[in-house]
A protein has these predicted regions:
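Short secondary-structure transition/capping segments
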Residues: 7-8, 12, 63, 68-78, ...
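Catalytic, metal-anchored helix/loop core of enzyme active sites in primary metabolism
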Residues: 14, 19-23, 93-196, 201-207
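A conserved regulatory-domain signal marking ACT and ACT-like small-molecule sensing domains
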Residues: 150, 155-286
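A generic structural signal for short, solvent-exposed coil/turn residues
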Residues: 73, 88, 111, 129, ...
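Substrate-binding/catalytic subdomain of NAD(P)-dependent oxidoreductase enzymes
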Residues: 1-2, 6-109, 113-116, 143
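Intrinsically disordered, low-complexity coil segments
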Residues: 75-77, 86-91, 122-135, 223-246
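Residues in well-ordered beta-strands of folded domains
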Residues: 56, 80-85, 95-99, 118-120, ...
Length: 286
């Protein structure tokens, strides 16, 4: 989508043809497959025994080509689907979501069917790759070949009676850390709006966030050609005249997910909103 400008539907179809996504792509695009893997890593790294559906999970279905254009407006950022488990004091933030990520971040360069695991270890003595990353494991994560090799390897281990499937020991005693409630996860956020083109909208949105003590960091508004607006309207099956809609993005200073969602729940019902706002975290901000 980023490089070709393809719609989500066309990009998904191509991924299915290449074997990167299942015929039923729900687990791939909803983030549930990534969540399952993240829960295993959270158990090993933090001693958390979590069930699917107990964490904040956001898929990629809301992402459109226009979001990549805004992300790359200065060539400085892109969008990646991240699965994150991060210790904050005696709690652990666990979530799966698309995220705005700086181009200079190592994970921004992971493309196609390649997967990467980036982790930070206290007093690791390793070579720091990123501020939040001491070590990286990179390899193919989708497609017939990698999947077949992984499955065959598991079958061979079972046949030999090896005990890898008995479970991995946790690095942290079970129960020592707790799951951070999703609504208390804190960060900066990207929010993309498509509204009716009229005056006063940004002020109203800013006031709504302000009432919840959330500050707007930046407002991005690009020039869109008639062709871009028409394609955007078609992708959402909008009835509005494409020349009368206005996409724009705001970024928010650090806030809790509860604050952000409360504001958006109010804004989405305003008469100037054409489609529900699209939002996701900005990764790597302090």
């Amino acid at each position: 989508m980023e490089k070709s400008g393809k719609s989500y539907a066309d990009a998904l179809k191509e991924a299915q043809q290449k074997g990167y996504a299942e015929t039923n792509p729900t687990a791939d695009v909803s983030g549930s497959d990534a969540e399952a893997k993240l829960l295993l890593l959270s158990a090993v790294g933090f001693g958390l025994q979590l069930q699917p559906g107990t964490t904040w999970r956001k898929g990629i279905g809301d992402i459109h080509a226009v979001d990549f254009r805004y992300a790359g407006r200065t060539g400085s950022s892109t969008i990646k689907h991240l699965a994150v488990a991060k210790r904050v004091g005696q709690a652990v933030e666990v979530f799966v979501s698309p995220a705005l990520i700086a181009r200079e971040n190592f994970l921004a360069g992971i493309d196609g069917a390649t997967n990467a695991i980036c982790f930070k270890a206290k007093k690791s003595g390793g070579s720091r790759i990123e501020r939040d990353c001491d070590y990286v494991l990179v390899g193919p994560g989708a497609g017939g070949g990698p999947t077949a090799v992984a499955v065959l390897g598991d079958v061979c281990e079972l046949a030999r009676g090896e005990g890898r499937f008995a479970g991995l020991p946790s690095l942290v005693p079970e129960g020592a850390l707790k799951l951070q409630p999703a609504e208390e996860i804190t960060g900066s956020f990207y929010v993309r709006f498509i509204v009716k083109d009229r005056a006063g909208i940004v002020g109203d949105i800013g006031q709504t966030f302000g009432h919840l003590a959330v500050n707007i960091s930046e407002i991005w508004q690009l020039r869109h050609s008639a062709e871009e607006l028409r394609a955007l309207a078609e992708s959402y099956s909008l009835k509005e005249n494409p020349n009368e809609i206005l996409p724009f993005v705001i970024t928010l200073e650090r806030a809790t997910l509860r604050q952000v969602l409360e504001a958006l729940d109010s804004i989405r019902h305003r008469d100037y909103i054409v489609v529900d706002p699209v939002w996701f975290p900005i990764w790597g901000t302090k």
